[in-house]
């Protein structure tokens, strides 16, 4: 049994139902809601225009229905007596002089005047609807720019360790779907506002006509609300599952595209296709279920008003004691109002459905914008000026995960300014971890890294990173020109500076052979260049920075012998009188290093010059003999 089902209580319930989503952005402390509030404060004029146009639209519609009702009353009035007695409607409160003028007016001109007034009111309503859509469109565009900026800033603000824990597909989904989710929410809330005002306008018209009509309309609204309470939670749950499935599929496709070379090389194309096909079937099943649930809303919203019309028509006839002429204006106006209210109810039902479908995307937006569970780049600290004495590792340890074995364990060494220090060891020994610590990508879990006896943890990290030059085996180039890639991070560089850096990196020759020279676009990740050419562009970028510390992380490991020779020549010319950390792939490239560290299982097991380590005849000497034997076998 439904308790307290009076018209006033039903109206209050309906008002709370519509007002809830409208007030949520102003009450919630979630990041997306705070973003909407912040933008609303900045763009309050647009919101005022949106609210004002919504009110005018609702008023125009209500006034139109009132005019149509009066016109129908005029048509049904008896030929004798007053043409139209406005005194019969004390609840409206027509002024006395207006009542007298209308009562004495000729029937035909008065009827035509009422029709003209109805048309003017509908024109005003259309203008208000236009202003409403423009204002919400402008506001949504501003919010989309804000959320795109925030998401991009948030991803860049994460520490490298935290950001690398996300899948590429997840980050792309955050950046792509977050703005869309905000736009959907704003548009839906605007539609909920204007259609909610119109809904209450129609209910007010029905109340003025007869409380019985209002009871019928309120009962219809209650039935639709009950149906929505059954369907919307299922739609919301399905939306969340659908979003998770879409993200998984997008991540898998992204990985397949990025790993095409591996899939081709290992003959795993069919296996990858089967995996994606299975995920697509899962996604299709979820989409079908979501379609069934979503599609059920609109038919139900269409059937119930028709049932209400039949019931209320019978009630109206009973209320007027069977006098058809008395009931026709009220019934005709009611049917028109209910038909138009039905359209608004369908829109409102669709709005709630879209908000439910959009809830998972909003949750993901809140997830990336919320600081909870995230580690951010370190800001602040003492600005780094220049390297004066050198770099010292003091009992440094590093664990990538709390429960994982340490990548580095008690590492200590000194790299004086102007010296070259080389790291050698088997794959996974911890060499690149040392470079990652120096570049600030990770923070040590134990010990200290001292830059001129200043703890790196207390330095302003960007000022330190801007004085580094890094050339790694995995060179990243932007889809831009060669000149832009070389000058990346060096906004002060002139064209001549870029050309000089390219020449010192042994890149001027192949650049001159390109049709557009330095203005040649390299393609995504530099796919239009060979591996050796990409490495030389990366080296040119490092040279242009004039770094205090040059880090070479197996910079020639993936190159053929000719490309390696060119890159190695450029490196040897540039590294003179510089502080250099080299992670060596071929030991022959580091024989002139001032100090060589042999790393095994995260520890330094040997250190010394090339000659000293060969003389000891232990780990380094064994690596040297192995590599020398392989090279002789290949050449033989």
Residue ranges of predicted features:
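Membrane-integrated ABC transporters
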Residues: 1-69, 74-118, 124, 131-136, ...
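Juxtamembrane loop-to-helix connectors within ABC transporter transmembrane domains
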Residues: 39-40, 136, 156-201, 258
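An intracellular "coupling" helix at the cytosolic face of ABC transporter transmembrane type-1 domains
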Residues: 41-45, 160-161, 177-189, 237-245, ...
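Hydrophobic alpha-helical segments in the permease module
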Residues: 118-125, 129, 221-222, 294-305, ...
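A hydrophobic transmembrane-helix motif
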Residues: 190-232, 290-332
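Cytosolic ends of transmembrane helices, especially the final helix of ABC transmembrane type-1 domains
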Residues: 268, 292-295, 340-368
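ABC-type nucleotide-binding domain
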Residues: 384-636
């Amino acid at each position: 049994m439904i308790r307290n089902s009076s018209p006033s209580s039903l109206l209050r319930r309906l008002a709370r139902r519509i007002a809830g989503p409208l007030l949520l952005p102003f009450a919630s402390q979630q990041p997306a809601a705070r973003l909407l509030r912040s933008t609303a404060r900045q763009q309050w004029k647009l919101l005022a225009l949106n609210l004002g146009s919504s009110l005018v639209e609702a008023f125009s519609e209500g006034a139109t229905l009132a005019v149509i009702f009066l016109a129908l009353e005029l048509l049904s009035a008896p030929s004798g007596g007053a043409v139209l007695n406005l005194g019969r409607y004390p609840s409206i409160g027509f002024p006395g002089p207006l009542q007298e003028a209308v009562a004495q007016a000729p029937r035909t001109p008065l009827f035509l005047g009422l029709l003209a007034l109805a048309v003017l009111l509908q024109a005003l309503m259309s203008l208000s609807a236009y202003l409403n859509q423009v204002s919400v469109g402008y506001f949504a565009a501003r919010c989309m720019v804000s959320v795109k900026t925030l998401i991009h800033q948030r991803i860049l603000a994460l520490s490298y360790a935290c950001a690398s824990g996300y899948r590429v597909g997840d980050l792309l989904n955050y950046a792509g779907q977050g703005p869309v989710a905000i736009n959907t929410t704003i548009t839906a809330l605007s539609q909920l506002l204007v259609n909610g005002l119109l809904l209450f306008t129609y209910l007010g018209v029905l109340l003025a006509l007869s409380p019985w009509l209002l009871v019928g309309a309120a009962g219809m609204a209650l039935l639709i609300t009950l149906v929505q309470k059954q369907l919307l939670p299922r739609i919301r749950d399905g939306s969340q599952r659908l979003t998770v499935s879409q993200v998984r599929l997008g991540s898998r496709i992204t990985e397949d595209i990025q790993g095409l070379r591996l899939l081709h090389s290992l003959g795993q194309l069919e296996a990858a296709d089967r995996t994606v096909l299975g995920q697509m079937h899962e996604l299709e099943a979820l989409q079908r279920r979501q379609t069934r649930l979503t599609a059920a809303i609109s038919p139900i919203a269409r059937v119930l008003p028709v049932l209400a019309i039949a019931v209320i028509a019978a009630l109206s006839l009973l209320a007027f004691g069977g006098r058809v002429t008395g009931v026709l204006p009220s019934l005709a106006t009611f049917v028109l109002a209910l038909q138009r209210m039905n359209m608004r109810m369908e829109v409102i039902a669709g709005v709630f459905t879209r908000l439910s479908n959009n809830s998972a995307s909003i949750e993901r937006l809140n997830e990336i914008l919320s600081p909870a569970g995230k580690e951010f780049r370190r800001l602040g600290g003492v600005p780094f000026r220049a390297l004066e004495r050198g770099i010292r590792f003091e009992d440094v340890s590093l664990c990538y995960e709390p429960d994982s074995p340490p990548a580095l364990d008690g590492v200590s060494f000194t790299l004086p300014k102007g010296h070259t220090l080389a790291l050698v060891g088997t794959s996974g020994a911890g060499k690149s971890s040392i470079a990652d610590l120096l570049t600030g990508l990770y923070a040590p879990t134990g010990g200290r890294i001292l830059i001129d006896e200043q703890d790196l943890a207390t330095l302003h990290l960007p000022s330190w990173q801007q004085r580094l030059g890094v050339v790694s085996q995995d060179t990243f180039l932007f889809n831009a020109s060669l000149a832009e890639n070389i000058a990346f991070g060096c906004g002060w560089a002139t064209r001549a500076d870029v050309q000089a850096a390219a020449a010192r990196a042994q890149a001027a020759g192949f650049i001159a052979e390109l049709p557009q020279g330095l203005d040649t676009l390299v393609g995504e990740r530099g796919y239009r260049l060979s591996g050796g050419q990409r490495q030389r562009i990366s080296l040119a970028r490092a040279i242009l920075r004039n770094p205090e510390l040059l880090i070479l992380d197996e910079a020639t490991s993936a190159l053929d012998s000719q490309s390696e020779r060119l890159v190695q020549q450029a490196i040897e010319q540039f590294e003179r009188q510089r502080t250099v950390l080299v992670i060596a792939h071929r030991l022959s490239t580091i024989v002139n290093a001032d100090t060589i560290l042999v790393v095994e299982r995260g520890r330094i097991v040997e250190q010394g010059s090339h000659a000293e380590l060969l003389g000891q005849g232990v780990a380094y000497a064994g690596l040297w003999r192995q590599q020398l034997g392989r090279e002789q076998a290949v050449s033989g």
